[in-house]
Amino acid sequence: KCFEVGEFCGSPMLLGSLCCYPGWCFFVCVG
């Protein structure tokens, strides 16, 4: 899972987490 900005994630994350798409985390997914 992705919790920190700049962390890499390889799969879509759940609502409320820092990523909603594969890649680098830069925002919180809200919808």
Curated annotation (Swiss-Prot):
Expressed by the venom duct. The keyword Secreted applies. Keywords: Disulfide bond, Knottin, Secreted, Toxin. Belongs to the conotoxin O1 superfamily. Disulfide bonds join C2-C20, C9-C25, C19-C29. It comes from the Eukaryota. One of its GO terms (cellular component) is extracellular region. The keyword Lyase does not apply. The cysteine framework is VI/VII (C-C-CC-C-C). This is Conotoxin pc6d. GO terms for molecular function: toxin activity. It is found in: Secreted.
